[in-house]
């Protein structure tokens, strides 16, 4: 019986988070989302929302945890499965852009647009996530010298920030275009431009 209650509670939590992500994807996402609007969207009372989450901040925390877990775990898989530096970089970029494309509502969180009206701590978590990804990209670039005996013409820190800035720009464009301009759009055409910097 207790197991059924826990499953129901978990399902309701997921339903609330999915509703929030969906609202972030819709035109509601460009404005502050209130718990009243969210409760109406889920079809429950505000009190019911607070039975599952102590605050809206905690809901955003849960969505950010999902973003972190999804990206970092997959980056780790790429690093585990692939040894070629350029292949690793390409796959990491495609992962970030593809994740964004599949999760438009979460992209508003990743770009900070959805967090403008929320606690600063949430933006700090997103900043830390991107810093962590940049560190991983920089490490991949540095390992080339160890593996191949030859590094890049440019400093690895500069290259890592440039590659991540490209991703962040594509994510911002996705949000700005109301999700019409897909982050992976024209990636094949853009890749040689990025690759030219990795000499």
Curated annotation (Swiss-Prot):
Residues 34-53 bind DNA. It is found in: Cytoplasm, Nucleoid. GO terms for cellular component: bacterial nucleoid; cytoplasm. It holds the Pfam family SlmA-like_C. The keyword DNA-binding applies. Transmembrane segments: none annotated. Homodimer. Interacts with FtsZ. It comes from Photorhabdus laumondii subsp. laumondii (strain DSM 15139 / CIP 105565 / TT01) (Photorhabdus luminescens subsp. laumondii). GO terms for molecular function: DNA-binding transcription factor activity; transcription cis-regulatory region binding. Required for nucleoid occlusion (NO) phenomenon, which prevents Z-ring formation and cell division over the nucleoid. Acts as a DNA-associated cell division inhibitor that binds simultaneously chromosomal DNA and FtsZ, and disrupts the assembly of FtsZ polymers. SlmA-DNA-binding sequences (SBS) are dispersed on non-Ter regions of the chromosome, preventing FtsZ polymerization at these regions. Belongs to the nucleoid occlusion factor SlmA family. This is Nucleoid occlusion factor SlmA. The lineage of its organism: Bacteria, Pseudomonadati, Pseudomonadota, Gammaproteobacteria, Enterobacterales. The gene is slmA. InterPro entries: DNA-bd_HTH_TetR-type_CS, Homeodomain-like_sf, HTH-type_TetR-like_transc_reg, HTH_TetR, NO_SlmA, SlmA-like_C, Tet_transcr_reg_TetR-rel_C_sf. GO terms for biological process: cell division; negative regulation of division septum assembly. It comes from the Bacteria. Residues 10-71 form the HTH tetR-type domain.
């Amino acid at each position: 019986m207790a197991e059924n209650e826990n499953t129901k509670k978990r399902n309701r939590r997921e339903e609330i988070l999915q509703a929030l992500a969906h609202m972030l994807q819709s035109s509601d996402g460009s404005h502050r989302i209130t718990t009243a609007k969210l409760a109406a969207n889920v079809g429950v009372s505000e009190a019911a929302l607070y039975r599952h989450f102590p605050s809206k901040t905690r809901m955003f925390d849960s969505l950010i945890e999902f973003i972190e877990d999804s990206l970092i775990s997959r980056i780790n898989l790429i690093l585990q499965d692939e040894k070629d530096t350029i292949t690793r970089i390409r796959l990491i970029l495609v992962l970030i852009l593809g994740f964004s494309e599949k999760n438009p509502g979460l992209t508003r969180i990743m770009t900070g647009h959805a967090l403008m009206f929320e606690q600063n701590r949430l933006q700090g978590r997103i900043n830390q996530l991107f810093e962590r990804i940049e560190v991983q990209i920089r490490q991949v670039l540095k390992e080339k010298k160890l593996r191949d005996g030859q590094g890049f013409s440019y400093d690895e820190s500069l290259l890592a920030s440039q590659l991540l800035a490209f991703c962040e720009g594509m994510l911002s464009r996705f949000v700005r275009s109301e999700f019409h301009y897909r982050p992976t759009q024209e990636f094949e055409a853009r890749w040689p431009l990025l690759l030219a910097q990795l000499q």
